Amino acid sequence: LLQASIIGKPLWNYISDETTRSLYQQMVARVREGRSAQFSLRCDGPDCRRLLEMTIRAGANGTVEFATRTLRLDHRAPVAMLSRQVPRSTDLLRVCAWCNRVDAGSGTGQWVEVEDAIESLRLFELPLPPQLTHGICETCFAAMSKTIQNLNT
């Protein structure tokens, strides 16, 4: 995404998963009431694992500011599955938007690191890897729900 194409557009245009969008909308609503939210999330690249801390706070004139800082950066051998340059099939593989683990169980609640998902789902045996889409695992949903609940007190 290019900066010029997203500035001034609603954030919600870029969050496709309904549950994830709802959690962020709830946090933004609390921030607009004068609270601030802070939580950790993963934002991995093909050659690294990044643990970030996000702070959401009220800005000037009714705006909301999102700030992140890197808590930890671990380099690893590149994982092609995470590269935007790799051609993809039309199939979807769900990745948690907070912990970056992969849904490896078709609704069984089994979420694993990408390297483990590649092996257990035999992704390298596919003609083309699936597209990645974001959702939220049960563990992160519970943690984020608690974060939002704490904003209400």
Feature locations, PLM:
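Sensory/regulatory domains in signal-transduction proteins
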Residues: 1-83
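PAS-family sensory modules
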Residues: 26-32, 58-153
